[in-house]
Amino acid sequence: MRPLAGAHTMFSCVDFTPGAVVPLHSHPHEQLGVVLQGELEMEIGGERRALRPGDAYVIPGGVQHGARAHAGPVRVLDVFYPLREDYLKLFK
């Protein structure tokens, strides 16, 4: 799904295949999210959490984080502030 952006905030729906890995990384944007489908393990600032549908997370800007999808498809809804210009350019 294409990201949806307002003047200052955006959201993006992300689908993961089973076993997909998002390596540890950081960005200056605050990121909030909720798991819509499936299960994944997230590492945020050195702390690991198992997340299921309905679970939410908050990632402050500049904090290292990554994820690993478990069996079955995983879908999350991420919200970013400020806008992720890099994401928006990918979908132009």
Where are these regions (language model features)?
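A short glycine-rich, His/Asp/Glu-containing loop-to-beta-strand
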Residues: 1-23, 78-79
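Conserved beta-strand positions that form and line the central face of beta-propeller blades
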Residues: 3, 50, 66
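Structural motif
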Residues: 10, 39-41, 48, 64, ...
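Double-stranded beta-helix
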Residues: 10, 66-92
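Short, conserved beta-strand element in jelly-roll/cupin
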Residues: 15-17, 27-42
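A short, acidic/glycine-rich surface segment
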Residues: 20-23, 44, 88
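Short beta-strand His + acidic residue motifs that chelate non-heme Fe in jelly-roll/DSBH
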Residues: 24, 42, 59, 65-70
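Short acidic-glycine-tyrosine-enriched beta hairpin
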Residues: 46-61
